[in-house]
Amino acid sequence: MTKRSAGILLYRRTSSAIEVFLIHPGGPFWAKKDAWSIPKGEYHDGEPPLDAARREFQEETGSTLALDRHETDFIALGAIRQPAGKEVTGWALEGDFDPASLVSNTCFVEWPPRSGRQIEIPEADRGAWFDLPTAHSKIFRGQEAFLDRLVAALG
């Protein structure tokens, strides 16, 4: 069965550009990789994807920004498939967030791989704002489409 995730691409307009907020995955596997993602997470049958995206944004950033906004504030960006096969459904939301205030939930992963040892890591270890060209070079493969769809939606 295909794993499904939902997430939110937070964006803001500056005097010269559109910027997007991305998170860097936590843990030793990602520590030295310059790979970034929209805040997202898996959802289950019966859970509306937008509800999951809002919940995951809060879990991965500590911000209630997405929970406090009305459904009509979100721009549907559709679904993409990441190279490993996970389907991600995304929404864009205009807003601001101070990356220094990021507080992420934690999870357990096996590390080192196949060691049987579990370590606790943050789901996200940091967040940052990027202009669109920089975001294109940093975001997980497959998620670039969300950036392009945001630009198209904003006209």
Question: Model-found features: residue ranges?
Answer:
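Generic low-complexity, intrinsically disordered sequence content enriched
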Residues: 26, 69, 106, 151-154
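Unchanged
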Residues: 41-141, 145
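C-terminal/domain-terminus segments
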Residues: 143-155
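N-terminal strand-loop-strand
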Residues: 1-38, 91
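Residue-level marker of positions within ordered structural domains that often coincide
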Residues: 13, 96, 152
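A periodicity- and composition-biased signal for non-globular, repetitive helical segments
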Residues: 30-31, 46, 149
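Residue-level detector of intrinsically disordered, flexible termini
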Residues: 5-6, 16, 51-52, 134, ...
